[in-house]
Amino acid sequence: MKAIILHGGAGTRLRPLTFSGPKQLIPVANKPVSQYVLEDLISAGISDIAIILGETYPDLVKEHYGDGSKFGCDITYIYQGKPLGIAHAVYLCKEFVGNEEFIVYLGDNLLQHGIKKYLEQFLNGNYDAFILLKEVEDPTRFGVAEFDEKGRLVRLVEKPKIPPSNYALVGVYFFKPVIFDMIKDLKPSGRGELEITDAIQMLLDRGYRVGYAIVEGWWLDTGKKDDILHANALILDERIKRSIKGEIVDSKVEGRVTIEEGAKVENSVIRGPAIIGRNCLIKNSFIGPYTSVDEGSQIIDSSVEYCVILREAMIRDVDRLEESLIGRYAKIVKKEGRRRALRLSVGDYSEVYL
């Protein structure tokens, strides 16, 4: 069994952060989104994994994951370049996959309970393809499933104006190698891409066995700022434990808070769930629930809540920062004048003076 992680796409909805790195490396709870994907695959027993690289900073992806040995897997890199569709990316992996069954996992998707249960359903059901579905409020943003009166899957429609159901395709697919024969016969869609939904539809039309499962628990497509903040809150709420390894001086740490080695908290209040990364400085500040502060960042004389702060950022003299996504090496500094609550999405190396 092999797996493919899709790590391409321009990430336009997460600009300005994606001007300086791929969207899948944006951290939630101080860990890149695509690392949760990698760990999910490994926990399901898969160790032979390909990462599809796009045009957006492929070297940063290689730098983070290396050959996979530090994560307990073997990683092969395959370059797609321009985003020509999921099916195109999958077809590039034909030689890598060989005759084995495989999983395709979008690198910006998160599943609360992981894929292990669904992998077992795919293997035990002897399906040619197996998809995951989740009921959503606005299915027009996704590929959508249509069923017959007996609940059998009959059609998949990509981002329909009039959805046949509210069941969206989750970004995880299970395939036998026969999918490559379908992709070979595809023509580009109206947006110039080879659509994986069209390839799966071809399987259905030609009588192959395509199964599905309704995902239990939450599923997140972390394509926008609010999605990142929501994912951060959910993961902090579920997975963060109280662990104090840094230095605490004249401060209160309330609830489930992780403070990593080398961090210093001075004359401050931290209320969990929250995580403070290595070598951070929190001084004369309040860190509220659902906040992640990545390594090397400094928060001084400020109040921060429900935020994701990337590494080496500085926030100083800000009365209230909330619902914000702050890039690496960014500076948010209050100079003079009236203080007020702020809501920001600030890219890497930015400087904001208030």
Regions found by a protein language model. Name each.
Residues K2-I5, R13, P27, K31-L106, ...:
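Conserved N-terminal catalytic core of the sugar/cofactor nucleotidyltransferase
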Residues L25, A145-F147, Y212:
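A structural signal for short hydrophobic beta-strand segments in well-ordered beta-sheet cores
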Residues Q112-K187:
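Conserved core of the sugar-phosphate nucleotidyltransferase
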Residues G9, T56, P177-V178, D226:
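Alpha-helix/helix-capping structural signal
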Residues A50-G54, L132-L133, L325:
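Short internal beta-strands
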Residues G9, D108, E135, K224:
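Active-site glycine-centered loops adjacent to acidic/histidine catalytic or metal-binding residues
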Residues P27, Y173-F174, T222:
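Short aromatic/basic micro-patch
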Residues R152, V178, D185-L354:
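Left-handed beta-helix
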